[in-house]
Amino acid sequence: MSKKTIAILTIVISLVIDQASKIWVKLTMRSGDEFMYIGNWARIHFVENEGMAFGMSFGAGFGKLMLTVFRIIAVYFITYYLSQQIKDKKSSKGFVFALSLILVGAVGNIIDSIFYGQIFSHSEGQIATLFPAEGGYAKWFHGRVVDMFYFPIYRGILPEWIPFFGGKFFEFFQFIFNVADACITVGVAIILLFQKQFFKEEATQDIQATSSNP
């Protein structure tokens, strides 16, 4: 499979899953609704935030707009870099796959920010409507990002003997995220874990090219 095919399939499939899961949550749950699907530690918990990963916020209004604009600029540069890596014979398929995941993560949350405020009604105390007659809940570029995956694997009071945090409530994993967030995390993790392999291949090929052209 070519690097171009890997990139296209990764982007299309991951983006469809991201948006399908968000739209499903918006059209079937109210903000704050939750249900468990694996014991008590794997849950779908519907929340919306102003745009940062894992449920974190960057403020509303101007701050929200600037975050969206920054993401659009980042997507441009990631797309350009990815296209260069696809053309570069020295780059590995694994690196292209990881970059594609990072691009999906950025694009997925941009779609929420740009469009969701216009195409959905609000979800507070009600299930949202798609294309409401009265209009959406926010202006263009001011939509909220939909998060839903919640894994509170451990929740409890830490033992007193633990320095600084002993006796305090602790929750792991407390962040609520979506498929786009997961794509960014996995993409970055792949690059960090296999960076020596990815960039060693490029360095080796550079040396071979130099040796063959004295």
Which stretches of residues belong to each language-model region?
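Alpha-helical transmembrane bundles and membrane-interface segments of multipass inner-membrane proteins
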Residues: 1-214
